[in-house]
């Protein structure tokens, strides 16, 4: 399915390499833009999808104007860009502006090692898993600085909640990925996907043997992105908007962009680690070549990855529309007393499954 794309990209790559070192730099910048621009556009349409889907769940219409609601998010962005950025009188203005950038940067930098297909990846790093853990844990520093620089008790309280929540669930997420690493025998994300390939389709995915780790990673991902029902960081009924309470205009839009970019990132990572990434759920069930379209259905490709991502991204919206917010003590109890012990136990179970040959791909 990605052959046509590679046929276009490869000649373009060779053309850039003809310019020497400057060509390598330009090609790298182009690859970054090929990820960043679609990501920003995806966030805009994701916001529209969220408003539409929640509207349908609540028996409402959702956005209906500005291109039948399709371009409502773009209108909101333009509105925010032209709004004045207000600074609290006692705020630290430099850190106040830098904080949303520190939150946004890791959410974009993490995409450097995320593969979309066998050859569609910006950097096929062998330590991609460690890189992801580092990048996804950096965003909280921007939130903490935003709460401190705002000089507001509501913002500071939201920032402290975020710090405690990230510390609690980052451990569980890391332990869940240790199980994935043991099962795949690699820290390379492309190799983790290919470790789930086989002739049994979705039965070869890590979803089945690592199901408890899948649940832990999914729920922890929701908590890491501060989304409902774990949105105590910006609980409107308690602390107004948390660390974002003093923000307006374009700097507020940066926080908004970082949050939704992280949601899409977590949806990608769940699909890669547990659902075989771009692999087809019926891969290996049919042999032989029939047609390019039918061959793609059982051989897999990046559209399969996008379908899986759409499911998990929509699940975020379903959670928001369906579940009430947890109390802060309930969130802490779930992270420390349930998820961390469960992941530790299942790491040992995963090692036993690899040792006994139940999982064939681990080394």
From Swiss-Prot:
| Gene, per the UniProt record | nuoH
What EC numbers are recorded for this enzyme? 7.1.1.-
Q: What class of enzyme is it?
A: translocase
Name of the protein described by the UniProt record: NADH-quinone oxidoreductase subunit H
**Provenance organism:** Xylella fastidiosa (strain M12)
UniProt keyword Transport, yes or no: no
Q: Note the NCBIfam families from the entry.
A: PRK06076.1-2, PRK06076.1-3
Known InterPro entries for this protein?
NADH_UbQ_OxRdtase_su1/FPO, NADH_UbQ_OxRdtase_su1_CS
Q: Which reaction does it catalyse?
A: a quinone + NADH + 5 H(+)(in) = a quinol + NAD(+) + 4 H(+)(out)
Give the UniProt keywords, A-Z: Cell inner membrane, Cell membrane, Membrane, NAD, Quinone, Translocase, Transmembrane, Transmembrane helix, Ubiquinone
- What is this protein's function? NDH-1 shuttles electrons from NADH, via FMN and iron-sulfur (Fe-S) centers, to quinones in the respiratory chain. The immediate electron acceptor for the enzyme in this species is believed to be ubiquinone. Couples the redox reaction to proton translocation (for every two electrons transferred, four hydrogen ions are translocated across the cytoplasmic membrane), and thus conserves the redox energy in a proton gradient. This subunit may bind ubiquinone.
Q: Name one GO cellular component term.
A: plasma membrane
